[in-house]
Amino acid sequence: MLLKPGNKLVSPETSHHRDSASNSSNHKCQQQKPRKDKQKQVEQNTKKIEEHQIKSESTLLISNHNVNMSSQSNNSESTSTNNSSKPHTGGDIRWDAVNSLKSRGIKLGISDFRVLKRLGYGDIGSVYLVELKGANPTTYFAMKVMDKASLVSRNKLLRAQTEREILSQLDHPFLPTLYSHFETDKFYCLVMEFCSGGNLYSLRQKQPNKCFTEDAARFFASEVLLALEYLHMLGIVYRDLKPENVLVRDDGHIMLSDFDLSLRCSVNPTLVKSFNGGGTTGIIDDNAAVQGCYQPSAFFPRMLQSSKKNRKSKSDFDGSLPELMAEPTNVKSMSFVGTHEYLAPEIIKNEGHGSAVDWWTFGIFIYELLHGATPFKGQGNKATLYNVIGQPLRFPEYSQVSSTAKDLIKGLLVKEPQNRIAYKRGATEIKQHPFFEGVNWALIRGETPPHLPEPVDFSCYVKKEKESLPPAATEKKSKMFDEANKSGSDPDYIVFEYF
């Protein structure tokens, strides 16, 4: 896709129309006086510099390939994605291993992997640590296995297909890479990256007082925010953010997981000129948060006026760059999906919801990282849902969290989605909050994570066996998958489809 400042993202097929309009405008400019021609040239040079800068800062947001949003049909054969279309995974040994087998005419299937350990389970499947046979060096993956019969009987086949299609689109350092997917007579299988650091929920449990420091929480929240921003650029509403779904890679950086609840919709990303604001930091006092849902004063849209009469010089913009914004607001899902403690009010009230639910869950997420618990948890699930709807946001009396962190959480946990931070301007608005001051968004992958996982000793999982499993062993593996998928039910995980 082509990125044009001040305009929507446009495909190569339609970009020439905009170029034609630009050429017509330039022709008119040639009829003006020389002084205006010189001024126009200065403005064009400035614009080119800004385009170059924003392109650099947008590297983590949008891949340089077209996104195919069309639905894909099931393929009974193995499918692996060409790593040339995944720029951020260059030099990945997992791709080398997969492509090496593919170059020899091998179509990956379940028999090409040695199952080492069950890592966890979700609502529609279980995840296993697996080793790719015949790979040199030895290569490990996480394989999500979903039972076909169970998906059909529970009316969740579409969710499994949606997850696979979404994973096939993703190309981002904080999102999963789908190396291959295939199916057998009984199972759908997704082959992804194995994250040796576990998830943020388990890591939080190991921290003093079971909560992260503010610096650590800021680091993890920053990377999650970039992942959500990228998803929204693709027209994907995540809908399942919680620490359990934020995995920690072996380098300490994060990866979002589980996309079976995600919602896809159309989206129109745009570049909008921003102006540097000044004045107050927009801190809200606790009384205001209790009395109602207020939007922090630090967050007001900063739009570029399109009138030519009001053009400003370069100095007037104070070096600010265009903002890339994309909020898929043209969707109103009626699905009741998610985890009780993270459900947004509009989901519970069945009012229809869009991308703003991700910003609500982002607020709950930050609150839990800093306090070790979610803000609306009740004695039971019904009490929790009631608290989300009817109780104001409160912070613990002993809370040592800074006022800027509280202010961000208050803005995110506004019960009316239209008044919530980022409802119109998305992650761009959140990035400018004082809580994230000092974060270098373009270079965050180079930052030192607050926690580095211990190296995994895979030898304790590897069992001595032949390269080719006999039929009896294959049947044993199939039964193991059956039992694991049948037991994968989470009582705190609810999914009700109204339509």
Curated annotation (Swiss-Prot):
Domain (Protein kinase) ranges: 113-436
Alphabetical UniProt keywords: ATP-binding, Kinase, Nucleotide-binding, Serine/threonine-protein kinase, Transferase
Biased composition range(s): Basic and acidic residues: 39-55
EC number(s) from the headed UniProt entry: 2.7.11.1
Kinase listed as a keyword: yes
Residues reported in the UniProt entry to bind ATP: L119, G120, Y121, G122, D123, I124, G125, S126, V127, K144
Tissue specificity remark: Specifically expressed in root hair cells.
A GO MF label: ATP binding
Start and end residues of each stretch annotated as Disordered: 1-92
Activity control, per UniProt: Activated by PDPK1/PDK1.
Domain AGC-kinase C-terminal: 437-499
PROSITE patterns (alphabetical): PROTEIN_KINASE_DOM, PROTEIN_KINASE_ST
Comp. bias regions, Low complexity: 63-85
Catalytic activity: L-seryl-[protein] + ATP = O-phospho-L-seryl-[protein] + ADP + H(+); L-threonyl-[protein] + ATP = O-phospho-L-threonyl-[protein] + ADP + H(+)
Any one biological process term the GO annotation gives: root hair cell development
Top-level division of the source organism's lineage: Eukaryota
InterPro entries for the chain: Kinase-like_dom_sf, Prot_kinase_dom, Ser/Thr_kinase_AS
PTM section of the record: Autophosphorylated and phosphorylated by PDPK1/PDK1.
Residues forming the catalytic site: D240 (proton acceptor)
Further remarks about this protein from its record: Plants over-expressing RHS3 show altered root hair morphology, such as spiral, bent or branched hairs.
Function: Involved in root hair growth and morphogenesis.
Similarity field: Belongs to the protein kinase superfamily. AGC Ser/Thr protein kinase family.
PANTHER family: FLIPPASE KINASE 1-RELATED
Subunit structure: Interacts with PDPK1/PDK1.
Protein name: Serine/threonine-protein kinase RHS3
Chain's gene name: RHS3
